[in-house]
């Protein structure tokens, strides 16, 4: 059974930068989990990409769909392989284009969808308090072409009565957002994507990530929450297998439950007890 994660975001939303940062962090190991690209050439590409980022060079935006094959392990014991399908920003602007149709099919075939939102969308230049900030950003997002295209994609999928996979909404560059307004960001996303989030049977998680600052010469990465979107995605895949294993009374159910619990620990910083 194939495992697939599809990643979508507007141009320059930070998808490529996030991928490189996530890969370097996870390949080094986080909570005894480690990630590696199965293709050595992809590993080399991501390593070189991270080197450029660390030197203050911003990566070029993705201009075509890219697929990576990753392997995740715990204490060097295999957990799973999965495909990471990254689509270029702006692809939803042409719904009838073959690339857009391929995207829709990949969403339908995916175990998890990561929707990347550019943290710059949430930067205010005028707000003096939380209410002013929320009203300003809600208006800005309402008229953002990229966000509207994403909302329309969900509308088209719903017209086909398609059940969406778990969705992770990821705000990149969250260091640009004042700490006092971070909770308002969650509210803004919930209102913007209300029809997506308020369906009780749908699994949607909101996350904020950053590499720790603007990518300029001399940039020193200080990643925050960089592992959580990938942990959420892997957890969604494990849940798929757990349901199947329990239905078939498969002995692997205990194995899956063990790793599901371990991966859930990635979220303890976001949701402290």
Predicted regions located by residue number:
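A short hydrophobic beta-strand->loop->alpha-helix junction that borders the nucleotide-binding pocket
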Residues: 8, 38, 87, 117-119, ...
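Alpha-helical scaffold elements adjacent to nucleotide-binding pockets in ATP/GTP-utilizing enzyme cores
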Residues: 6, 17-25, 109, 149-153, ...
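Short catalytic/ligand-binding loop motif for oxyanion handling, primarily in non-cytosolic enzymes
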Residues: 14-15, 91-93, 123-125, 176-179, ...
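Conserved C-terminal guanine-recognition region of P-loop GTPase G domains, centered on the G4
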Residues: 101-200
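Canonical P-loop GTPase G-domain recognition
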Residues: 4, 168, 175-242
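C-terminal non-catalytic interaction/localization modules
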Residues: 2-7, 27, 31, 162, ...
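Switch II of P-loop NTPase G domains
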Residues: 59-114, 120-129
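Conserved G1/Walker A P-loop phosphate-binding module
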Residues: 1-69, 73-82
């Amino acid at each position: 059974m194939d495992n697939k994660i599809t990643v979508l975001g507007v141009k320059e939303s930070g998808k490529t930068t996030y991928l490189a940062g996530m890969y370097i962090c996870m390949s080094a190991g986080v909570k005894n989990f480690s990630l590696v690209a199965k293709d050595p050439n992809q590993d080399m590409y991501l390593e070189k990409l991270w080197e450029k980022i660390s030197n203050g060079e911003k990566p070029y935006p993705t201009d075509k769909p890219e697929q990576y094959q990753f392997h995740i392990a715990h204490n060097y014991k295999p957990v799973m392989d999965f495909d990471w399908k990254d689509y270029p920003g702006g692809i939803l602007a042409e719904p009838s284009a073959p690339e857009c149709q391929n995207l829709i099919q990949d969403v339908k075939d995916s175990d998890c969808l990561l929707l990347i939102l550019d943290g710059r969308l949430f930067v205010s230049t005028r707000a003096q308090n939380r209410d002013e900030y929320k009203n300003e950003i809600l208006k800005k997002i309402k008229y953002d072409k990229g966000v509207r295209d994403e909302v329309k994609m969900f509308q088209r999928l719903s017209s086909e009565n398609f059940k969406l996979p778990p969705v992770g909404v990821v705000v990149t560059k969250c260091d640009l957002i004042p700490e006092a307004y971070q909770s308002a960001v969650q509210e803004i996303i919930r209102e913007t994507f209300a029809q997506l989030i308020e369906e009780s049977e749908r699994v949607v998680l909101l996350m904020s990530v950053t590499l720790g600052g603007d990518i300029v010469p001399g940039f020193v990465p200080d990643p925050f929450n960089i592992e959580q979107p990938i942990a959420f995605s892997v957890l969604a895949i494990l849940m798929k297998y757990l349901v199947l294993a329990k239905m078939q009374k498969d002995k692997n159910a205990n194995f899956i439950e063990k790793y599901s619990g371990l991966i859930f620990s990635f979220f303890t910083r976001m949701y402290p007890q």
